[in-house]
Amino acid sequence: MIGILKKVFDVNQRQIKRMQKTVEQIDALESSIKPLTDEQLKGKTLEFKERLTKGETVDDLLPEAFAVVREAATRVLGMRPYGVQLMGGIALHEGNISEMKTGEGKTLTSTLPVYLNALTGKGVHVVTVNEYLAQRDASEMGQLHEFLGLTVGINLNSMSREEKQEAYAADITYSTNNELGFDYLRDNMVLYKEQCVQRPLHFAIIDEVDSILVDEARTPLIISGQAQKSTELYMFANAFVRTLENEKDYSFDVKTKNVMLTEDGITKAEKAFHIENLFDLKHVALLHHINQGLRAHVVMHRDTDYVVQEGEIVIVDQFTGRLMKGRRYSEGLHQAIEAKEGVEIQNESMTLATITFQNYFRMYEKLSGMTGTAKTEEEEFRNIYNMNVIVIPTNKPIIRDDRADLIFKSMEGKFNAVVEDIVNRHKKGQPVLVGTVAIETSELISKMLTRKGVRHNILNAKNHAREADIIAEAGIKGAVTIATNMAGRGTDIKLGDDVKNVGLAVIGTERHESRRIDNQLRGRAGRQGDPGVTQFYLSMEDELMRRFGSDNMKAMMDRLGMDDSQPIESKMVSRAVESAQKRVEGNNYDARKQLLQYDDVLRQQREVIYKQRQEVMESDNLRGIIEGMMKSTVERAVALHTQEEIEEDWNIKGLVDYLNTNLLQDGDVKEEELRRLAPEEMSEPIIAKLIERYNEKEKLMPEEQMREFEKVVVFRVVDTKWTEHIDAMDHLREGIHLRAYGQIDPLREYQMEGFAMFESMVASIEEEISRYIMKAEIEQNLERQEVVQGEAVHPSSDGEEAKKKPVVKGDQVGRNDLCKCGSGKKYKNCCGIVQ
């Protein structure tokens, strides 16, 4: 009954039947494609491109295009895709995952949808797990695409920007997932659009899709950098701020907690640091450090806002009074307080840009993937990536013998049995592949085999090129290969002619916590209808067994008087192992889903900033955008200084001081003018005055220079604030889980606080851009500059996120050294005077 119901409701079977009809259409075209000459076959590419411009779609072209690729593959590669490979290609073209068993020719299958989608001219990315496979596939399958008149590029980590641009400009680009992600991040840090390497993300086919979208989903790609100069600048700024007097050199509004330099304070700073104009663009960092130093001394109070504990500044939660260890103030305020209190200044390496593979690959217009094992993660692929898993039938029936697990009482008994099995099979000449979960296990088995005099190869993921050679030899007579965690995926184990009748023996030394990894190991045997055998050896001391209560089973084995050499073969134990694996997979899926929910907060913010950066880069005139920022800044300032209900309590003097100091000239806005107006009427005359001053500034220089000046200011401010914001979000994320103890949902809290921080950053960007546009003097040799030099942090091999290391620095400037502020004078005659 269940079997009948399965057939009726089997979605996969219905998909296969539907695709079978398309395969028949492709087969029917063979008679008209086969007689074509090489030139005529190549000419089909141009014909298809023209038909696309006339309104046909890639779906309309599919049968013909696939028939053309099949014929070209036969001529160029000597390989003719089978019907099941055509099905796999259709599934990929439709944006799904093709589950094709090992040895069924996934690489050749991918050429079909790659060719079809490359006809649009928008670019197709073929994604692999390592550069060796990318180079191999680009050179082997590239011949086929080039024969048909398409261009093929390969994107490697070692390439220059120009080489990468060329690779991405090709119709088809082969690359690793890491390199694609890093290039995307780097493209959103460049200052000129000519420096971008990637085109809009159109279509990607991911090889070993489960490895990239599931196993590596929790590993973020990070570009980090270090603000080298700032540590000394905090100390100089701190020394300078100590010399300032309240009301004379700076003004402080108790209600708004706003502190700023007065005209006298600005003059004092210019004298102290030997500069002409504090608001000059080249002194952005200095002004920022002075402002934060002021906030540290005037706004932040020891034992109220923070405490000093064991040489560190620890924030005090204003609502609960609890210490918030591990949290740091953003925008350099924390370092300014460290300078104020005389503790060591920790200048952490900053995260300049970050993205997870989940969010990177979800940006593609269409995404598909192929692997031998995806069905167990079908729910995840559907919910997160909107891709269905379609299991493609094998070309020949699988005749592999998958044996029931053998369970031993102890690890020692298990390993003895494993080695004995290997030795027996080796004597008969049968090739053996031994799969281990940990490197230590592979080394232990290697030692035991060496003692028995059995020659063998060890394979772990250290050398991709050598890895392929070892895997290629793993199917010859008498070969013994030990592989850790299925290193060597992507390369087939081909059987030697003299062992075709016995096939490969695959021995698993313990169950992985994921059924998918076990299935990958099993799938190495019995490819393309070959014979083969798979056997897993388990012990009651294995981690998975221990984790899910093997004590009862062990006690039963003791009661039955079973020793280490006697295994039990029990369906009950096998079912228990499988249910344990399902539980672990469920937990891991929940963890990845939760990561995505957190990362989505930053994703939305990242998309806003990157989109605006792109617009700035491509825009010829930013004046309209900047006027909008000035308007917002003025409206916020008016609202902040007139928030009290009673008119007498409005701080009009503070508003006038703020406007004349930060945006206009002394006397441009007068108190008596504003006092006659309601708050909603105040902004208009102020904005009119700002635009008048803006127009005056425009007349002082050629238009081209003014437009470039605007871009320099916008890039400098946006990039500085955005990198500080990412860092602050990092710190928020690290401490947010502690909120769960207070019966608060950490995710909701992270979303709310993250949004508030983003809004605050946007306001800060608008205010700072307005200030620099109005106050900075424009130099002749304007140049856009990177705020911090970024460096890609490659994910560690064990999949853990690369941790940020604090860099602790003291004052390292000698009295006779050149001053770090860039004046060219000796430290003792420059910033050293202030101290």
From Swiss-Prot:
| Assembly, per entry | Monomer and homodimer. Part of the essential Sec protein translocation apparatus which comprises SecA, SecYEG and auxiliary proteins SecDF. Other proteins may also be involved.
Residue positions binding Zn(2+): C819, C821, C830, C831
Cross-referenced PROSITE patterns: SECA, SECA_MOTOR_DEAD
Major enzyme class: translocase
Q: Where in the cell is it found?
A: Cell membrane; Cytoplasm
- Catalysed reaction equations from the record: ATP + H2O + cellular proteinSide 1 = ADP + phosphate + cellular proteinSide 2
Q: How is the cofactor bound?
A: May bind 1 zinc ion per subunit.
**Gene3D superfamilies per the UniProt record, alphabetical:** Helical scaffold and wing domains of SecA, P-loop containing nucleotide triphosphate hydrolases, SecA, preprotein cross-linking domain
Tell me the NCBIfam families matching this sequence.
PRK09200.1, PRK12904.1, secA
Q: Which cofactor does it need?
A: Zn(2+)
Keyword annotations for this protein?
ATP-binding, Cell membrane, Cytoplasm, Membrane, Metal-binding, Nucleotide-binding, Protein transport, Translocase, Translocation, Transport, Zinc
**Which family would the database say this protein is a member of?**
Belongs to the SecA family.
What are the GO MF terms of this UniProt record?
Answer: ATP binding; metal ion binding; protein-exporting ATPase activity
Q: Which residues bind ATP?
A: Q85, G103, E104, G105, K106, T107, D492
Alphabetical GO CC annotations of the entry are: cell envelope Sec protein transport complex; cytosol; plasma membrane
- The name on file for this protein is Protein translocase subunit SecA
